[in-house]
């Protein structure tokens, strides 16, 4: 199966399945000399870890990362960094009833038509479980970007289902399970999710990710544009159905006199461009919005077919996130950091900066 590697100079190859012995990644191209220990990576993994609240899957995975290579005496050596996360709480029997059927909205049908075989246990390769190695690699990227350029990447949830979450403060984000930037809205979110779980259904979300502190000049023209690579990476996150930068789809209703960010001696007067013009960073914060669809694995019965093409009713049992957007924030942060470190290294290679 191809398509498992992200990046040009800072490359991350992801491997494993949801119910296999382990998942992990190989990070190739990390500069040498970066102080790195497992605790640096674990802090990010713990933000994404399942079973941390009643609003996410109750699968209990410690997600303890093992650094297999590429680090010696606490610093990176410049050689490939092998990261391993063992699966310890898989319950494959929960999927025996859907081994020969296709769940509506899931990757089951598409995988089977492409490969002629699929692993139904927890979604196999298409499971959101495979985002853990992405977060692990992103932790390395975050640390390097912060140390070299002072770049900070962070995110939050701006909408859960029909509930908009007005931004209040970054300080509110780590204090709740939703990564909501407004503590006053959290009780409403909790009540909504409690009812959703009782209904056996799921819902989507909107996530915002912001990168601050990067210089102008990162990115490439035409095919390797910085914004194109960001969109490419974000669409690799399970359940993402839309990506926009800056004003995004609101640009449709704007006039050019409003949308074009005016430039003053002090800098840009606005940031409708989301920090990227012509595929290259402007030095403004990069702002990315993600639309995340409802989880496909739900207890509500839906119509489908089996491998013989016969009509069936599908009900997915097991442990699932009723809203995958709740745990998506640290994953989206990791993906943005991975794209940025790759372009930082490309800029250094081409222009020396």
Curated annotation (Swiss-Prot):
Its cofactor is FMNH2. The keyword Amino-acid biosynthesis applies. Pfam families: Chorismate_synt (PF01264). FMN binds at residues 125-127, 238-239, 278, 293-297, 319. Gene3D superfamilies: Chorismate synthase AroC. Reduced FMN (FMNH(2)). The keyword DNA repair does not apply. GO terms for cellular component: cytosol. It catalyses: 5-O-(1-carboxyvinyl)-3-phosphoshikimate = chorismate + phosphate. It comes from the Bacteria. One of its GO terms (molecular function) is FMN binding. GO terms for biological process: amino acid biosynthetic process; aromatic amino acid family biosynthetic process; chorismate biosynthetic process. Pathway: Metabolic intermediate biosynthesis; chorismate biosynthesis; chorismate from D-erythrose 4-phosphate and phosphoenolpyruvate: step 7/7. NADP(+) binds at residues 48, 54. Keywords: Amino-acid biosynthesis, Aromatic amino acid biosynthesis, FAD, Flavoprotein, FMN, Lyase, NADP. Its EC number is 4.2.3.5. Homotetramer. Belongs to the chorismate synthase family. This reaction introduces a second double bond into the aromatic ring system. This is Chorismate synthase. The lineage of its organism: Bacteria, Pseudomonadati, Pseudomonadota, Betaproteobacteria, Burkholderiales. The gene is aroC.
């Amino acid at each position: 199966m191809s398509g498992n590697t992200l990046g040009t100079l800072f490359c991350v190859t992801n491997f494993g399945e949801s119910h296999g012995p382990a998942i992990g990644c190989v990070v190739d191209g990390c500069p040498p000399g970066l102080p790195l220990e497992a605790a640096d990576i674990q802090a990010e993994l713990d933000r994404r870890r399942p079973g941390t609240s009643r609003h996410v899957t109750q699968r209990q995975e410690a997600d303890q990362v093992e650094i297999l290579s590429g680090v010696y005496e606490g610093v990176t050596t410049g050689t490939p960094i092998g990261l391993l996360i063992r699966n310890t709480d898989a319950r494959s029997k929960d999927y025996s009833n859907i081994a020969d059927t296709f769940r509506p909205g899931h990757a089951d049908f598409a995988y089977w038509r492409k490969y002629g075989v699929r692993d139904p246990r927890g979604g196999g390769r298409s499971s959101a479980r495979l985002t853990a190695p992405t977060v692990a690699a992103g932790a390395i990227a975050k640390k390097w970007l912060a140390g070299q350029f002072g770049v900070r990447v962070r995110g939050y949830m701006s909408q859960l289902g029909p509930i908009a979450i007005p931004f209040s403060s970054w300080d509110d984000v780590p204090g709740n399970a939703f990564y909501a930037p407004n503590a006053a809205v959290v009780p409403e979110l909790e009540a909504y999710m409690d009812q959703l779980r009782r209904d056996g259904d799921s819902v989507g979300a909107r996530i915002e990710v912001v990168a601050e502190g990067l210089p102008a000049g990162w990115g490439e023209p035409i095919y390797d544009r910085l914004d194109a690579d960001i969109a490419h990476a974000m669409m690799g996150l399970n359940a993402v159905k839309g990506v926009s930068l800056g004003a995004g789809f609101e640009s449709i209703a704007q006039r050019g006199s409003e949308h074009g960010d005016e430039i003053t001696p002090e800098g840009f007067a606005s940031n409708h461009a989301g920090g990227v013009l012509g595929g290259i960073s402007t030095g403004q914060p990069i702002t990315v919005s993600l639309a995340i669809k409802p989880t496909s694995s739900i207890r509500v019965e839906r119509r489908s077919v089996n491998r013989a093409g016969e009509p069936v009713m599908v009900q997915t049992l097991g442990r699932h996130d009723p809203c995958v957007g709740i745990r998506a924030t640290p994953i989206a942060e990791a993906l943005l950091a991975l794209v940025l470190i790759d372009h930082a290294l490309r800029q250094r290679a081409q222009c020396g900066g």
